[in-house]
Amino acid sequence: GATNLVTGIATANYDSVPLVCFTGQVPTSLIGNDAFQEVDIVGITRSISKYAVTVRKREDLAETIRKAFYIAKTGKPGVVVVDLPKDIQRAYGSDFYPKEITIRGYKPNTSVHMGQLNKALDILRHAKKPVFLIGGGVNIAHANKEMTRLAELTGIPVITTIMGKGAIPTTHSLYVGNIGIHGSYAANRAISNCDVLFSIGTRFNDRITGKIEEFATAAKIIHIDIDAASISRNIVVDVPIVADAKKAICFLLEKAEPLSISEWVNAINHWKKEYPIDMGRSGLTPQMVI
């Protein structure tokens, strides 16, 4: 049964979905003996989850479960696998679920690097053709209202990944569309022609970038993400910023100014009008669903 979770675990983890999976295991005394239906699920899922652990002592159960939910929800959300041997499941105890938890070596970043954000603002002030590229990190941080206000304050058009859709209303005049192979002509052309690409909460996977060497070649790239490992992994950026999306956006709201980019916005609106996504006249299409 545990192996049936593998695809779901990988998908949820790649999409930064907080998920705790409890799996059954043979008794601790039989682990490593090739017992009936014994599978090293921790080993199988370690590379596709945020954390995976086998509980080998009843005394560790309550604390491990508390840690599992804490790790899954904090920092960059992800999947935690808790493997429970049969004897641990059947054990009795009176342990209390700890209210506070400290995990050595795990300290999610929640600060805002003001120096890097000021550098990003300086680049924005001189931009003629800027765009925001918004990923799921903004939705995870519940920063939708703040993101909409930032777009309206600066006047910068907003492009989203599929996971970032909803970061601002899709009916908003500054919303361009989705990027990448599932995206619109206007969004992809805007990325190709922008001079500043301000990305928040994305990981620049291949569904977005296509050929990396041809992605936003004329742009200075600013990237905000809570996960340092996601920055400059696929696309080398000019201004890396490790920060919580909502805190960073709130800082930008205090410092940002309206930009004089009406010619650029008009060009994007022209592309949206000339090359709309054709939904067809009957039935559902993939474009309509997305």
Place the predicted regions along the sequence by residue:
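Structural signature of the thiamine diphosphate
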Residues: 6-7, 12-23, 46-99, 120-123, ...
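Cofactor-binding loop segments of dinucleotide-utilizing enzymes, especially the Rossmann-like FAD-
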Residues: 24, 57, 84, 135-136, ...
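Glycine-rich, anion-gripping cofactor-binding loops and their flanking helix/strand elements
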Residues: 136-222
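Phosphate/pyrophosphate-binding active-site segments
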Residues: 59, 95, 122, 218-290
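Active-site-proximal loop->helix
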Residues: 26-47, 170-175, 232, 236
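Short gly/pro/ser/thr-enriched loop/turn and capping motifs at secondary-structure boundaries
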Residues: 2, 26-31, 89, 164-169, ...
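Cofactor-pocket helix-loop regions in the catalytic cores of large enzyme subunits
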Residues: 59, 84-173, 265-290
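Short, hinge-like loop/turn segments at secondary-structure boundaries
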Residues: 37-40, 71, 98-100, 150, ...
